[in-house]
Each structure stands twice: as C-alpha cells, then as structure tokens.
Amino acid sequence: MSRKYFGTDGIRGRVGEFPITPDFVLKLGWAVGMAFRRQGNCRVLIGKDTRSSGYMFESAFEAGLSASGADTLLLGPMPTPGIAYLTRTFHAEAGVVISASHNPHDDNGIKFFSGQGTKLPDDVELMIEELLDAPMTVVESARLGKVSRINDAAGRYIEFCKSSVPTSTDFNGLKVVLDCANGATYKIAPSVFRELGAEVTVLAASPNGLNINDKCGSTHLDGLQAAVVEHHADLGIAFDGDGDRVMMVDHTGAVVDGDELLFLIARDLQESGRLQGGVVGTLMSNLGLELALQELHIPFVRAKVGDRYVMAELLARNWMLGGENSGHIVCCQNTTTGDAIIAALQVLMALKHRGQTLAEARQGIRKCPQVLINVRFKGENDPLEHPSVKEASVRVTEQMGGRGRVLLRKSGTEPLVRVMVEGDEEASVRAHAEQLAKIVSEVCA
C-alpha cells in the first residue's frame, strides 16, 4: 500500500501549502497520539530546528497530542539525532522532529522516531495516515495530555556526543572552523568541540528564524572553505540545518564529502579491530568508495537513497557503519540515525590515530568523476517513465561501455529528478549528464 502523506523522511513542503499547514499538523499530532496510545500510556518528545515556523508547528502538534490524551515533552531547538537519542533515554513512545533539514527557511516538515530512536516502520506510518483520514475526536477534559519542557536537553546531548570518543580524548592544538548553518547545532556543536580541547572558530551560529541554510551549512561550503584558509585552520566542519549531515574541508580548502568521510571512519574501525561486518552506501555512493573499500577487503553494499534505507540494511546485516555522499553517516556503535557531530568526531579520531592531516588521510580513496544535475518537475506524471528518458538512459549506458554508471531517480523530499553519471573521464561524464538532464528537462516542461 502506497503512502499518501509520508515521503522518504516524514512529511515536508512549503510552509502554508498543504500539508505543511497548522490545521494539518494539529490533526497529525492527534493521529500520532492515537496511534501510539493504542499501546497504553503515551509520551512524545518534540524538538525542532531554528525556522521561525517551527514555533507555530510545535504548538499545533502539541495541541493535537493533547487532544488525543498523549503527554508532550518539549526539547526546543535540537539536532535531529539529539531528538532520537533523548527519545530513547526518556523511554518515550515516539520522537518528533520539526525540520526541513537542508532546505530553506520557507520549507518545513515533520519526521518521526520510534521509542528506540529509529525511523518509524512503514506499518506505523500507514496507521497514522489512516487516522489522518478519520474524524478527529477529543478525549474528555480529565484525560487531556500534559505538556512539560526538558530544560537540560542540550546538556544531555552534548555529554552523549562527547561519550562517543574515549574519555581520554584531547583535541588540544587542533584548529577547527565550524559552520552551524544557523541551524539546530548552533549552540551544541561549538560546546562539544571546545570541551574536547579544540580551538574553535564558529560560522553561521546566529539563527534569526529566516537564515537557516542561507548560503551556509553543508550544502553551501564556500564560506567555510575561505574561513579555513584565512584562519590557518587544520580543517573545517559543516553541518546542515538539523544536524544529521556533515561535510568537511581540509586545510587547503578542498571539500571532503560523505563518501570520503565514510571511508576514513571505516578504515579506522578496521585498523583498530572494531569494524563489524562491512559498509552500507547508497545508489549515489561514488564508485571510488566501493573500490577503496574493496582494496581493504571491506564488504560494501548499496541501499536505496535515504538514511532510513541505509539503517534498515545495517540492521538486516548486523553491520555498524553506513552513509550517503551527502553526509548522512550512521555509526551504529554510537547512535541509531545519521549524526553529524558524532560522525565528525569519529573522523577526528581517525586522523588522530594515524597522525595525519585530513588532506593526507583522504588520499586513501580516489573518487571517480561524478556529475549530479537536479531537474525540477511539476505534475503527477513520472518523468522517469517517459520513453524518451528510458531510451536516453540505455543509450548513454551503452556509450560508456561498462566504464561508468547512470542513475536517474526522483528525490524523496523535493520535486526533483536527480541525474547522476559516473565514469573514468570527467569531460565525457559531464557531457553525458548534461545530455540526459536536457532530455529529462524537456519531458518535465
């Protein structure tokens, strides 16, 4: 059964446009409360990023929960993985994240964690969707849900992040620039790295409700690259708006993406005898990652794009490490979802163990040229099912003669078709990608 409201990572869209409206979010809160109250008493945690609309949707969702009889614990601004962690530690039935991740401020969304801190199973999402289409009822006044605030939520999560590295860890002498995307990590990330001894320069840590991800964060690295060089820093770390993606910059200003970071962590875990199984990537993972892991005899498999699918594959195989080139990295030995701060700490530990700079350590992986072009589309028709697009994809694949990959996929969070071509020669890869993107664009017009 297909899902009506849920995408690959909750429900997301433009603020004020269905379903990202106060009335829908109130009904959603009620539906979530009703779904989890079927199992008995229900407590739900709510956290959010720094968008101005987050306050409106927090109030609406909280009202819906109360109407269902479920209790609410408010966390305030908190990285997505922090909400997953606190949902587990407070033994809540569910955690709610009000965020649109790396999207601009005029988007927002709602995503969920189970009581174990993992993404909701499909059957629970379908139950919530059924309730959304049912008439809303309100419990009697004596049974309305209560609301309270967890005042030390940030401190708890800071200590959890620090506990992901050995207690003897000291980054004294390490100069780091952090780009907090004016998002949910703006207070927490600087505290974590400073308390572990690093010398920290902070960018984009003054959220005003409208500047989240605005020319900053993991999808806009220009400012971080310049700052690392200007401050003669050892490296730079960029988070996205809700703190579940991380990208890094070496001391020369060169970008180190999620595939490279995943390799550095995997190699360190293997060298220290801590790697369990192999590594899970996605269909978008660079071929160079697969080849580099192959050289180390580390198994590698690809999941569908989306950290929920990476996590599902990890659980199915009982492996501990996976991620995406966008910077979602899941370290199951520490957490149950992509955690940007913890992933960054694991990379710093890998550098410390080898006594290398980030620029030196990344030489262990040679990425294949890869070009990704996003094509926006409207309407209900699936452009990937159009004969012209299918024929072009087959033709380009044949032209590459087995020396590359073509991947066309729709984004699970935005109305985009992602055109990805990968091969051994950059000019031909770019030409093939532009050729495919042009055909997809014509079909979408």
Curated annotation (Swiss-Prot):
Binds 1 Mg(2+) ion per subunit. Mg(2+) binds at residues 101, 240, 242, 244. PROSITE patterns: PGM_PMM. One of its GO terms (molecular function) is phosphoglucomutase activity. GO terms for cellular component: cytosol. Its cofactor is Mg(2+). Keywords: Isomerase, Magnesium, Metal-binding, Phosphoprotein. HAMAP family: GlmM_B (MF_01554_B). This is Phosphoglucosamine mutase. It comes from Pseudomonas aeruginosa (strain ATCC 15692 / DSM 22644 / CIP 104116 / JCM 14847 / LMG 12228 / 1C / PRS 101 / PAO1). The gene is glmM.
